Curated annotation (Swiss-Prot):
Keywords: ATP-binding, Cytoplasm, DNA damage, DNA recombination, DNA repair, DNA-binding, Nucleotide-binding, SOS response. It is found in: Cytoplasm. Can catalyze the hydrolysis of ATP in the presence of single-stranded DNA, the ATP-dependent uptake of single-stranded DNA by duplex DNA, and the ATP-dependent hybridization of homologous single-stranded DNAs. It interacts with LexA causing its activation and leading to its autocatalytic cleavage. NCBIfam families: tigrfam_recA. ATP binds at G69, P70, E71, S72, S73, G74, K75, T76. GO terms for cellular component: cytosol. Belongs to the RecA family. GO terms for biological process: DNA recombination; DNA repair; SOS response. This is Protein RecA.
Amino acid sequence: MAAITNNPDKEKALGLVLNQIERNFGKGSIMRLGDAARMKVETISTGALTLDLALGGGLPMGRVVEIYGPESSGKTTLALHAIAEVQKAGGVAAFVDAEHALDPTYSAALGVDINNLLVAQPDTGESALEIVDQLVRSAAVDVVVIDSVAALVPRAEIEGEMGDTQVGLQARLMSKALRKIAGNIGKSGCVVIFLNQLRQKIGITYGSPEVTTGGTALKFYASVRLDIRRIQTLKKGSEGEYGIRAKVKVAKNKVAPPFRIAEFDIIFGQGISRMGCMLDLAEQSDVVLRKGAWYSYNGDNISQGRDNAVKYLEENPKIAETIEQQVREKLELGSLSFAISQGDGEEEE
């Protein structure tokens, strides 16, 4: 192979062309990768510590995320928890309610500041995606949730007759919208979360017959895809059902190792059980030990049974905080905080 020498003329020519590109296309349009202000991708918490660990820290900012699964599996609950975490950090959140099914009371119970949550309920898919595009372009919103892709009905389908056949309209709409939105998402640092439903393909003999709606464009543009399933119904004696156990598989992850699995409890009317997640990770990292049905911490038995252990942590917040700190240190989860961009370009630590 021929030797490549460092020629001063080449360096000068490179400097000139880089300056010309920046003048033509704006500052930051081209750069050396090592010159980037932040090489590390910032993340936001999902509200479930077990899922944050599986994702390598949380949902990546400036990326597209898809959450899909069967009905009543926890998709909207997970998205609302992400909104609540962003708002707690001082960020701005928007919810595009294409299904017209957002429950303000439930959202508030999950910790969402409904007084400051931006909500849009568009009539057509074009309107919904145009709203998303404008919110992303503003660089003033930190997370946008679209609920759901299946409800993004093209205008032509709405204006047509009920029996009309409209082939591939929604897939073409999603493909065009994502081409427009993707670049702006990276520049603005906004997380765009698409919730999606599952359908069954007909005549499939081998492999899974399940397929997400809206074509394949979202699969390519999404940096993270989460497959959420309900695996168990939680019951408590005569009180009956009080929640579900959800399992999330990271089907795709461009910023951390994929195919990891996380489980957590979703309590009806309350959302993701934070203490339940923490107890699972504390047991996994040997901060809390379990022998049979008994849970112990620092050599002392704290409760018998998982439900009682969760209740103990809820009733003893100082001990729970200490355990959480030890879990984060052992699993290198960090604080999971993220910087919210301010108007002057400064960042909040």
